């Protein structure tokens, strides 16, 4: 029987207590057979196809199934009565060991899905066989440039091409039949800082639109639109203003600058607001919507000492998809101070409120409130917290948060509830118009924060979280244990009544996104390695299957040759999954596809047993304190606290064989693990620093070792 790992203390809480290429090398490997079918299938995908498909959803042509990103399928061959009869049709090895966050897209039985390191796979869903694989050959030593694992949330399809945003900033167009590159653009050209792409591109009206992430690293947010056929850049919109001594790009930036205090010189640290995930499109209104990210640095007092809302951080922004021109915005967290991004997936829906039909945006960002907005004009309709929060008591009738002053007092340790991991992170939610419910992966990951009053941009320092790898948060993660408790749950949320209809508790935070169907079913993967089906109206568990590793992505469903299939890409990871896990099953990234009466055998699961605590490494006890500070600045977010965390998709150093720690310089300086994402600390750490790290690692293991 598999033993689940206890997450009752919350990984980040324990962490602080004890204390992230070139075109010529890209490669596609294609097989013959279904390639011609793939070409014909994707050639049909355009705006008309996507809108027509939304009426019946036989295919899953975009990551959210439709432009509204409802993740609702009208298929009902699999339903609440027969979902118990699902069996495996096939499984496909993605050959990855890091996080997999993509939703598979499927047209005419051809699946396209991305895995870690931006690798793209084309799969024949009739057999589960590979058609082709494209590897953009990302420099694996650049994993440190992103906070939250080397993940990719999926691809876009349009008129015979597959588009992927690569980790290193390339937007790449591939031939859907062969996987060969058609064109690429460097979306980071002319920009500064540690920039990465993890989000899926969207294609609206023949333009491929992509953002980037990196607000922890001192960058300025923007999204860019490129011609889907040629790759020509069409427009770019920035989410925060630049240096006010220079001309602003447009009127929206001029207005935004009035909400920032220039004494904070926010532009030197970028200001943040990166748009790294959610985008939707209303063709009738000719409007696209995008969620913006957190401030850079995180601390509001550091970035804008005299206050101000700091537009357009933590906002939903409406843009003209033809020109990128700003239309309106609604800011969900004015003066963001806690990494409360609004990049989380949004849904466009038409619902009745007070008896009247309304065109709305449904959104549950990191800050813990569920928002209903009028998508025609951005007007606030309602907001209600869906988890406990301590930064605001609610929102007034004008849509302004009623703040709690103590939550902004960065002079002393404060529990952030929710914390920077969010009450809801990137894990997609879904909306079922039959039940009227939104199926939302909710969570809490305890974190205790305090402002770093001595913060300076790009100045690494002992004890400053991940500053040695480029973080610029101006916050400390404190040693004081958070009072709040971790949890993960599936919420069925009524957006009209603004209350939960039902909920299911999970063993850990960081569970997968959801899919709901006309068959009255909700599917969700879990951190402890299961794909589960629930009754959409009641939450009753109807079926589950083991997945060999934790699930963070959302499933998709589609019809092929008259049969409905459900597919999910699994691979434990993301920022929480780097150092923690909820199951000892740690299999490779895999696509599982299920069908009624499926008879395929499940692949063998790999048990990653926690080893023995490190012992026998000689160290100087006087170096433990210095090693602690160096570890926090360079190692902790990937490796966790030695011997306390169990390791996620990156090993915990407190359970390594002593020979690894004794020879730590061989791994820290241009070591063999660079090909798996380990940074090179040459020039950043000294030999004496490494001795201090060894002292902290072995010293911590010794301190927590049970006494005989």
Swiss-Prot record:
Induction: By ethanol and butanol.
Signal peptide boundaries: 1-31
Gene encoding the protein: qheDH
Organism the protein comes from: Comamonas testosteroni
Post-translation changes: In the crystallographic structures Trp-543 is oxidized to 2'-hydroxytryptophan.
Molecular function in Gene Ontology: calcium ion binding; electron transfer activity; heme binding; oxidoreductase activity, acting on CH-OH group of donors
Residues bound to Ca(2+): 216, 294, 339
Binding-site residues, pyrroloquinoline quinone: 101, 153, 198, 214-215, 274, 366, 425-426, 575
Catalytic activity: 2 oxidized [azurin] + a primary alcohol = 2 reduced [azurin] + an aldehyde + 2 H(+)
Name under which the protein is recorded: Quinohemoprotein alcohol dehydrogenase
Family per record: Belongs to the bacterial PQQ dehydrogenase family.
Compartments where found: Periplasm
Cofactors required: pyrroloquinoline quinone; Ca(2+); heme c
């Amino acid at each position: 029987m598999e033993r689940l790992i206890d997450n009752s203390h919350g990984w980040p809480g324990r962490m602080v207590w004890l204390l992230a290429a070139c075109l010529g090398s890209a490669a596609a490997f294609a097989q013959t057979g279904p390639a011609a079918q793939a070409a014909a299938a994707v050639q049909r995908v355009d705006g008309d196809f996507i809108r027509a498909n939304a009426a019946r959803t036989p295919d899953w042509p975009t990551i959210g199934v439709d432009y509204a990103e409802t993740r609702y399928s009208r298929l009902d061959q699999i339903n609440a009565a027969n979902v118990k009869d699902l069996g495996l049709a096939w499984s496909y090895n993605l050959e990855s060991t890091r996080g997999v966050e993509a939703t598979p897209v499927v047209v005419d039985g051809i699946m396209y899905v991305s895995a870690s390191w931006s690798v793209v796979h084309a799969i024949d869903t009739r057999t589960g066989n590979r058609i082709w694989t494209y590897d953009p050959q990302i420099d694996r030593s650049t994993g440190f440039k992103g906070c939250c694992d080397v993940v990719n949330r999926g691809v876009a399809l349009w008129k015979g091409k597959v588009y992927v945003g690569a980790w290193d900033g390339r937007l790449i167009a591939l031939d859907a039949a062969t996987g060969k590159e058609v064109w690429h653009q460097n979306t980071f050209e002319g920009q500064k800082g540690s920039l990465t792409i993890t989000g899926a591109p969207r294609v609206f009206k023949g333009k491929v639109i992509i953002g980037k992430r990196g607000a922890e690293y001192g960058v300025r947010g923007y999204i860019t639109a490129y011609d889907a056929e040629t790759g020509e850049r069409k427009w770019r919109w920035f989410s925060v203003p630049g240096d006010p001594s220079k001309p602003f790009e447009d009127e929206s930036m001029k207005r935004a600058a009035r909400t920032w205090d220039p004494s904070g010189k926010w532009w030197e640290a970028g200001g943040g607001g990166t748009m790294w995930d959610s985008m939707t499109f209303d063709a009738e209104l000719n409007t696209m919507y995008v969620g913006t990210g957190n401030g850079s640095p995180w601390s509001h007092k550091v970035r804008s000492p005299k206050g101000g809302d700091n537009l357009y951080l933590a906002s939903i922004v409406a843009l003209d998809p033809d020109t990128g021109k700003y239309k309106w915005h609604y800011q969900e967290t004015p003066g963001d101070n806690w990494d409360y991004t609004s990049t989380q997936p949004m849904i466009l829906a038409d619902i009745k409120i007070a008896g009247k039909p309304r065109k709305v945006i449904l959104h549950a960002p990191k800050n813990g409130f569920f928002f209903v907005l009028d998508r025609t004009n951005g007007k606030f309709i309602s907001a209600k917290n869906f988890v406990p929060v301590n930064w605001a008591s609610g929102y007034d009738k004008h849509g302004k948060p009623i703040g709690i002053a103590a939550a902004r007092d960065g002079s002393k340790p404060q529990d952030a509830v929710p914390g920077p991991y969010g009450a809801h992170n990137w894990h997609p939610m879904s909306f079922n118009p039959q039940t009227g419910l939104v199926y939302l992966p909710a969570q809490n990951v305890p974190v205790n924060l305090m402002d770093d009053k001595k913060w300076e941009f790009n100045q690494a320092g002992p004890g400053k979280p991940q500053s040695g790898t480029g973080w610029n948060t101006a916050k400390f993660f404190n040693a004081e244990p958070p009072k709040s408790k971790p949890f993960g749950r599936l919420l069925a949320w009524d957006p009209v009544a603004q209350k939960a209809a039902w909920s299911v508790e999970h063993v850990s935070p960081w569970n997968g996104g959801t899919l709901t169907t006309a068959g009255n079913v909700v599917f969700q993967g879990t951190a402890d390695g299961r794909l589960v089906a629930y009754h959409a109206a009641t939450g009753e568990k109807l079926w589950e299957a083991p997945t060999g590793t934790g699930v963070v992505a959302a499933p998709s469903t589609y019809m092929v040759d008259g049969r409905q299939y459900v597919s999910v890409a699994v691979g434990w990871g993301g920022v929480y999954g780097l150092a923690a896990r909820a199951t000892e099953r740690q299999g490779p990234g895999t696509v599982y596809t299920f069908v009624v009466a499926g008879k395929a055998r499940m692949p063998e699961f790999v048990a990653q047993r926690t080893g023995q605590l490190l012992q026998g490494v000689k160290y100087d006890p006087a170096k433990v304190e210095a090693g602690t500070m160096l570890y926090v600045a360079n190692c902790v977010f990937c490796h966790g606290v030695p011997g306390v965390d169990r390791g996620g998709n990156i090993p915990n150093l407190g359970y390594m064989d002593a020979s690894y720690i004794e020879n730590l310089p061989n791994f820290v300086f241009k070591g063999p693990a660079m090909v798996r994402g380990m940074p090179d600390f040459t020039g950043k750490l000294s030999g004496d620093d490494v001795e201090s790290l060894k002292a902290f690692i072995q010293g911590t293991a010794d301190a927590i070792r049970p006494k005989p």
